[in-house]
Swiss-Prot record:
Matching InterPro entries: 6-blade_b-propeller_TolB-like (IPR011042), PD40 (IPR011659), Tol-Pal_TolB (IPR014167), TolB_N (IPR007195)
Organism from which the protein derives: Escherichia fergusonii (strain ATCC 35469 / DSM 13698 / CCUG 18766 / IAM 14443 / JCM 21226 / LMG 7866 / NBRC 102419 / NCTC 12128 / CDC 0568-73)
CC terms in the record's Gene Ontology section: periplasmic space
UniProt keyword Cell division, yes or no: yes
Protein name (database record): Tol-Pal system protein TolB
Record's keyword annotation contains Membrane: no
Protein family per UniProt: Belongs to the TolB family.
Functional description taken from the UniProt entry: Part of the Tol-Pal system, which plays a role in outer membrane invagination during cell division and is important for maintaining outer membrane integrity. TolB occupies a key intermediary position in the Tol-Pal system because it communicates directly with both membrane-embedded components, Pal in the outer membrane and TolA in the inner membrane.
Keyword annotations of the record: Cell cycle, Cell division, Periplasm, Signal
Annotated localization: Periplasm
Subunit annotation: The Tol-Pal system is composed of five core proteins: the inner membrane proteins TolA, TolQ and TolR, the periplasmic protein TolB and the outer membrane protein Pal. They form a network linking the inner and outer membranes and the peptidoglycan layer.
GO biological processes: cell division; protein import
Coarse class of the protein's main subcellular location: periplasm
Amino acid sequence: MKQALRVAFGFLMLWAAMLHAEVRIVIDGGVDSGRPIGVVPFKWAGPGAAPEDIGGIVSDDLRYSGKFNPLDRARLPQQPASAQEVQPAAWSALAIDAVVVGQVTPNPDGSYNVTYQLVDTGGAPGTVLAQNSFKVNKQWLRYAAHTVSDEVFEKLTGIKGAFRTRLAYVVQTNGGQFPYELRVSDYDGYNPFVVHRSPQPLMSPAWSPDGSKLAYVTFESGRSELVIQTLANGAIRKVASFPRHNGAPAFSPDGSKLAFALSKTGSLNLYVMDLASGQIRQITDGRSNNTEPTWFPDSQNLAFTSDQAGRPQVYKVNINGGAPQRITWEGTQNQDADVSSDGKFMVMVSSDGGKQHIAKQDLVTGGVQVLSSTFLDETPSLAPNGTMVIYSSSQGMGSVLNLVSTDGRFKARLPATDGQVKFPAWSPYL
């Protein structure tokens, strides 16, 4: 926990800036089919009101994953603060087999101790499945809550939690000297900060696999350029500034390469740069447009969008040679894919019957599931554990971010009050 806090604190504090209105999750679809779980409000052991609702944050995290359906607080049969106080029969009567309890205690030095226990209500009374304690300053209480969520989620699902991750996205405001901002926030929209301001458009942020850098497209020179910015010190490295279009950056999972699309020879084609040497290799060629690369876990294969068959579809190509292979066949067109970290599935923008939604395709069976029901959905980005997708959609005259679980159970919006929000990118584990 301490190491994780140091890493997160390092670039967050160095990039402290005037913060704008935060995006917030607004629930559109419930998770009635998720696993029932009890999350009790954490007992506050200090004077006045608690500085953060830790139990509420944990409950929200678990609900947003789509895998859990936390019991409404009004229906909690009791409000224990420790495993010893949990009455298993009271919870079992509500089909709850796991309960999260905890306490928040202030310290004389201004810090807080956050403790929690995950209690098995189906076993012997007081059976604890997981527990931990964290000492944090006030500004890190939400982070401590997300840590509780991560540990509970992993214990109950076997999947690593992704609640301490972040989102990068572009906000376009009306007017001002710098109407375009690249921002980073917690995955749920809290604690945003500005990475870069620009008078010209910013597009397509992409995280490095260690979470220390963002690649993105900027038009500040009067034409598109690809840059990589280090979050800790703000240093910017220009990596591509060729004639015509430079876009769609994607770091390889091993961190050694950057894939992107260039149209310097006419049509859009894929290129890969070795980041250590700066050497660039062309991966695709021909008259078709090839863009929007996303890496497979082996750092040797790319999925990408191509119109070589007429309409955009998703293809796979090995960067060391070989002909691209088409991998999408359902719908009139499919594009802008993001491959899961285990390589078992991908999410993409799928169009059919005049509708454009986010869909999930199993890369083994080829089965496709439509996940979203919003309007003109774009730019999906997977959480590192593959359980959630962030994407943008049109709402009214602008764009907003949306969240959907990859099982389709949970849907939410992350509206911003100060502009259009586009190009979301989910960070790796931090």
